[in-house]
């Protein structure tokens, strides 16, 4: 569960290391984002030579959450951290690599490029 002011690790090589959620995209009163949902983030820390700089505002897709997510078959999945992958306006990832596993829910939300770059899909 990601809401406004939540800090997330950035799980790609775009240059950003940490980002803060500033808006959950969806219906007007939506408060929480889960795995596979789009959010708007502000980059809080970045590497000096990266494509993304500190202070940049970007869209992102949540790929891991510390709060467990229930699946249709009754199982739950949770991760040790909250993480997101930065995307552009065409919903393509900004980076060329994705670090760490991503949840199967990302595939169900049609972010195939992120799934193909991920080393593992759980």
Swiss-Prot record:
The entry lists its GO molecular-function terms as: large ribosomal subunit rRNA binding; structural constituent of ribosome
Matching InterPro entries, A to Z? Answer: Ribosomal_uL14 (IPR000218), Ribosomal_uL14_bac-type (IPR005745), Ribosomal_uL14_CS (IPR019972), Ribosomal_uL14_sf (IPR036853)
List, alphabetically, the SMART domains matched: Ribosomal_L14 (SM01374)
Q: Which GO terms describe its biological process?
A: translation
- Give the keywords, sorted: Ribonucleoprotein, Ribosomal protein, RNA-binding, rRNA-binding
Q: One Pfam family this chain carries?
A: Ribosomal_L14
Which family would the database say this protein is a member of? Answer: Belongs to the universal ribosomal protein uL14 family.
What does the UniProt record say this protein does? Binds to 23S rRNA. Forms part of two intersubunit bridges in the 70S ribosome.
Q: What is this protein's name?
A: Large ribosomal subunit protein uL14
- Which species expresses this protein natively? Salinibacter ruber (strain DSM 13855 / M31)
Classification of source organism: Bacteria, Pseudomonadati, Rhodothermota, Rhodothermia, Rhodothermales
Q: Which gene encodes it?
A: rplN
């Amino acid at each position: 569960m990601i809401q406004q002011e939540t800090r997330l690790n950035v799980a790609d090589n775009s240059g950003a290391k940490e980002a803060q959620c500033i808006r959950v995209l969806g219906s007007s009163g939506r408060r929480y984002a889960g795995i596979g949902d789009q959010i708007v983030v502000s980059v809080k820390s970045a590497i000096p030579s990266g494509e993304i700089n500190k202070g940049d505002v970007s869209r992102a897709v949540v790929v891991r959450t510390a709060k467990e997510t229930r699946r249709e078959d009754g199982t739950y999945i949770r991760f040790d951290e909250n993480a997101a992958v930065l995307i552009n306006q065409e919903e393509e990832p900004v980076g060329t690599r994705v670090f760490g596993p991503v949840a199967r829910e990302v595939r169900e939300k049609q972010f195939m490029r992120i799934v193909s770059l991920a080393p593992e899909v759980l």
